Amino acid sequence: MSRLLTIRQAEELHKSIIAYLSANNLSNAASALRGELGLSEEVFDTGTMVKYETLLEKKWTSIVRLQKKIMDLEARCGALQTELNNATPTSLSKRNQDPASWLPKVPARYSLESHRNTINCLAFHPKFSSIASGSDDCMIKIWDWELGELETTLKGHTRAVLDVDYGNTQSGVLLASCSSDLSIKIWNPLEDYKNIRTLLGHEHSVSAVRFIPGRNLLTSASRDKDLRIWDVTTGFCVKTIQGHSGWVRDVCPSFDGNYLFSAGDDVTARLWDITNISNPEAKLTMVGHDHVIECCAVAPQTSYQYLAPMAGLKKEALSKMSAVEFTATGSRDKTIKVWDRRGSCLMTLVGHDNWVRAIVFHPGGKYLLSASDDKSIRCWDLSQDGKCVKTLSDAHGRFVTCLRWAPSVVKEVAPSAESANGQTDTNDLLKSKDNQPQVQIRCVVASGGVDQKLNIFAN
């Protein structure tokens, strides 16, 4: 018995080897090994064979992929060390640009291709350098955005994949996807993205899916006009929310998990209080767009300082504001609207020449980014009444369908943490008081489009 493996690991290795030999028509070798190990046919039945026949190949390819990653990371570390050794004050000042003011620029760092049809949706892993993309080709692809490489392809949906989202749950980080096939699927990254659950209940295409922060719940929006809330562990629908009179295109939970913000074909955006899941309450309906609302977003609290004055609120009241004080919507009327909690439109952003398909707030709070069928990505400065300060005119060769910003990294803070020179390092961290966790902005934006490309914009 190998001293490197436990008894269980050794047994799994033996079964994997036997299954691999059998699957490759080497039955004599498999039979001989089974005899040497004393495994009877009753112990190694058909079910065991199916379970283990691809395990050896998966382990092998995983090791090769990890070895390549290690080599690439070692090369990058070497390059960074060389850059650090040759650094000058001027080069350091350029590199240490405040992440709160960083905006994407062309050309993209990577333009990744593998999908065979329109890319509809994207989602960043909250911790690792993975990004998921979903497409009209019915597939989900997992990429390494740092290396610009395809990691794996997930098959399971039978029609277009319309949305994907990563979320922290009681079972760890999971990936959710939804499709025109009426289903929602849950995938476990720690099990080679095994499909661990399929949620059924919607009666038409499921257009959006999002994990609800801190609640082990998932929310979905559908063409059947309903919102649904699901228990991630059991896969059961715990509540159906009705109120929209048309296709619900998008839904976004608040950062505290107590509200949902939805929008769709009925040209309205709606705010729901889900503090009590068994009795959700419709709080507000926003009316003002002239066409279908394609997308919606909840503003982070870092945006409040820029939006509060427009709402007639004093900055002293920032700490008392709710998790849904400000929201935004993007529409086929080519405009973006920013709303306050009273349902008043604070500003209308005009500039796109076609449908607005996706919006995302900058984690630093100062900017709002949008993607459109006019092939562009625009950056709007909320501190300048929504002025468009940057346009990536040809971000894609055709319609831009989706846009995501990599989630910030949360780091625990040691008391009185200081840099080497005795000063607290505020270079790329938004630090909070009382030794609360630090939030480090990741300067990475991804977009997808009808041109079947996934573009990565990174600092």
UniProtKB/Swiss-Prot annotation:
Q: Which residues form the LisH domain?
A: 9-41
Keyword check for Transport, yes or no.
Answer: yes
Q: Does the keyword Cell cycle apply?
A: yes
Q: Name one Pfam family in it.
A: WD40
The biological process GO terms on file are: cell division; establishment of mitotic spindle orientation; microtubule sliding
Q: Which GO terms describe its cellular component?
A: cytoplasm; microtubule; microtubule associated complex; spindle pole; transferase complex
What residue spans do the WD repeats cover? Answer: 114-155, 157-197, 201-240, 243-282, 288-349, 351-390, 395-440, 442-459
The domain of life is Eukaryota
Compartments, as annotated in UniProt: Cytoplasm, Cytoskeleton; Cytoplasm, Cytoskeleton, Spindle pole
- In this entry, which stretches build a coiled coil? 61-88
Q: Which UniProt keywords apply?
A: Cell cycle, Cell division, Coiled coil, Cytoplasm, Cytoskeleton, Microtubule, Mitosis, Repeat, Transport, WD repeat
A Gene Ontology molecular function term of the record: dynein complex binding
InterPro entries (alphabetical) = Dynein_regulator_LIS1, G-protein_beta_WD-40_rep, LIS1_N, LisH, PAC1-like_LisH-like_dom, WD40/YVTN_repeat-like_dom_sf, WD40_repeat_CS, WD40_repeat_dom_sf
Domain-level remarks: Dimerization mediated by the LisH domain may be required to activate dynein.
Oligomer and partners: Self-associates. Interacts with nudE and dynein.
Entry's family note: Belongs to the WD repeat LIS1/nudF family.
Q: What does this protein do?
A: Positively regulates the activity of the minus-end directed microtubule motor protein dynein. May enhance dynein-mediated microtubule sliding by targeting dynein to the microtubule plus end. Required for nuclear migration during vegetative growth as well as development. Required for retrograde early endosome (EE) transport from the hyphal tip. Required for localization of dynein to the mitotic spindle poles. Recruits additional proteins to the dynein complex at SPBs.
The protein depicted here goes by the name Nuclear distribution protein nudF 1
Q: Which organism is it from?
A: Talaromyces marneffei (strain ATCC 18224 / CBS 334.59 / QM 7333) (Penicillium marneffei)
Q: Show the taxonomic lineage.
A: Eukaryota, Fungi, Dikarya, Ascomycota, Pezizomycotina
